Every structure is written in structure tokens, then in C-alpha cells.
């Protein structure tokens, strides 16, 4: 039995999301070059994005981004046909402006960019064959729309989590059963 790398399975899904949505996203923002992907510890992801800021080539090729946060558990419960069940924590982020109000964020970021990426991400997971599921509506998870994504405090966000101004869809506890037959 060969090892299954969840981070690579998600990378493949994000590549398909990018292929499916890029023309639609470029109508909204011609500067979008892809739906980008990173995985790792949140601090590492932030450092990588900061390094891109120093590059003329990559400083504007960061968003939209799907980031898979590590570490995540993989339960190996010896179910026939299942390699493991991974419980994932991801974010889908896009750059924004700090002066936008909630309504503007939905009109300019959430509805045209973040929600289509979110829905296509779930669709591509469902279609991939790498995960045991029965359609998009059986992928249990918690989704949080984070307008001006910052650290949580008593009165909401108290600063940027990343160094950029971002709107975010946070996906917590996405449970994916890795289909051993197709991996």
C-alpha cells in the first residue's frame, strides 16, 4: 500500500477549481491569474505570502487563495475501502479594501469570487473520486464568512491575520474519507 498525501489531493482539487472558474473570475478582475493553493502552518503561509510581496512577479499573484492549515488529524479506522478520514481546516481568501462596509464586501468579493470558489471546491471534491461522498451536500463542515478577516476579540476582528487586507470564508471540520481504491 502506498501512502496517501492529503495535501496533494487537495492541491489537485484546487487546480480543477482554478481551471473551471478562471475565465469567470477574470471577467470580474482581469488581474486574477489562478485560484492559488498553499498548505502548511498558518505562520509559514503568512511568511510565504510576505516573500511574494517582495517579488515583482508574484506580489499580485497571491489571491484568491485556498489555504489548507496543518496540522490536521487523519483517523485510520480500518474501514474497508477507506485509507483514512481527514478533518481539515481551510480558508478561501481574497484581497479587499479596509474601507468597504459589509454590503460592499458581499457585492464585490463574497458573491462574485469567494462563494463561487467555495461551491466549486465542494463540487470538485465530490467529482474527484478520491473521497468517499454522496454529493456536495454530504460534505459536512462549518463555514464562517469573515468580513475583514482578523484575530477574534471581544468586538470582532482586531487586526489582520495575514499581512494583507482580506475577506475570508473559513471552513472548519471538513471531514473527508479518503477513497483507497482511487488513490
Name these PLM-found stretches:
Residues 1-42, 61, 71-183:
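Charged, amphipathic alpha-helical segments and their flanking helix caps
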Residues 47-72:
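Low-complexity, acidic Ser/Thr/Pro/Gly-rich terminal tails and inter-domain linkers that flank the onset
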Amino acid at each position: 500500500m502506498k501512502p496517501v498525501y492529503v495535501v496533494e489531493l487537495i492541491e489537485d482539487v484546487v487546480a480543477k477549481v482554478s481551471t473551471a472558474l478562471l475565465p469567470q473570475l477574470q471577467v470580474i478582475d482581469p488581474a486574477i491569474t489562478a485560484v492559488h493553493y498553499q498548505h502548511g502552518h498558518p505562520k509559514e503561509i503568512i511568511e510565504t505570502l510576505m516573500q511574494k510581496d517582495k517579488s515583482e512577479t508574484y506580489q499580485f499573484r497571491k489571491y484568491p487563495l485556498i489555504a489548507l492549515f496543518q496540522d490536521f488529524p487523519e483517523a485510520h479506522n480500518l474501514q474497508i475501502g477507506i485509507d483514512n478520514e481527514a478533518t481539515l481546516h481551510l480558508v478561501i481568501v481574497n484581497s479587499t479594501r479596509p474601507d468597504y462596509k459589509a454590503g460592499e464586501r458581499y457585492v464585490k468579493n463574497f458573491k462574485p469570487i469567494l462563494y463561487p470558489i467555495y461551491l466549486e471546491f465542494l463540487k470538485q471534491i465530490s467529482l474527484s473520486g478520491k473521497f468517499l461522498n454522496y454529493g456536495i451536500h454530504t460534505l459536512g463542515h462549518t463555514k464562517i464568512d469573515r468580513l475583514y478577516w482578523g484575530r477574534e476579540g471581544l468586538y470582532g476582528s482586531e487586526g489582520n491575520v495575514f499581512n494583507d487586507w482580506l475577506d475570508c470564508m473559513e471552513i472548519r471540520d471538513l471531514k473527508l474519507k479518503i477513497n483507497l481504491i482511487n488513490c
